[in-house]
Amino acid sequence: LLSAPAAAEKRKVEPLLLSMPLYNQHDYAEPVFAWNEQEVTVEESGCGAACVAMVVGYFEPDDAPEPDDVMSLAGELGLYRGDGLGRDALRLLLDEYGVEGRWRKMDAQAIENTLRKGYPIVEYVGAGYFTENGHYVVLRGITEDGKLLVADPNSEEKTTQKTYRFAAMIQQGKGDYPFMICEKEDASGETAQKGSAQRSAKRK
């Protein structure tokens, strides 16, 4: 017999896909700026910048920055500290593009509800599927078998060919508040959802 959590993982749900640009940080190997006489690139330390670019691209598909644009802005604002971008830096960068980011602790139901409202979620993950240390990814959809679609700026395969259990993503969250809910208001004060929330997210 399946345990309750295992049965929940196998439930059929309405699939969801938040349409956003899927940036790979390895496509951005050129130096963006220098920090303490060291060249800074998106490829080496720009997973956070890539995630910000993906989220902004979801809300503003016709005016989306690329990861090197976001990293350059981080340098201009003094948000880079030598080993990538901190969580507050990501929140401040999103704010520069008119997107509100709020770091939270979330359970599986909260994650699903948030995605179904059309809000992408940036997650800071620790050791596990994506990294041995710290790394940023974007939760971008749900499959019909109840798993998460994740945009990993460090791996095209993990972005396009893999799906992930809610429980595993929650377990691998790093810190007390590893999830950042991303929202944007339009001119009327309503929450903007300019990226399409497509009802198809099937994966083999």
Model-identified regions with their sequence ranges:
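Sec/Tat-exported extracytoplasmic proteins
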Residues: C51, V55-D63, A74-G78, L94-G98, ...
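Noncatalytic regulatory segments and standalone regulatory/sensor domains
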Residues: E9-P15, M20, N24, I142-K204
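Mid-length scaffold segments of soluble, non-membrane domains
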Residues: P65-M106, R116
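Active-site-adjacent substructure of cysteine-protease-like catalytic cores
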Residues: E100-S155, E185
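Extracytoplasmic/secreted cell-surface and envelope-processing proteins
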Residues: G82-D88, F130-H135, K158-Q161
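Active-site-adjacent structural segments surrounding the nucleophilic cysteine of cysteine proteases
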Residues: L1-L79, R203
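Extracytoplasmic/secreted envelope proteins and their assembly/folding machinery
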Residues: E44, G48-V56, P67, M71, ...
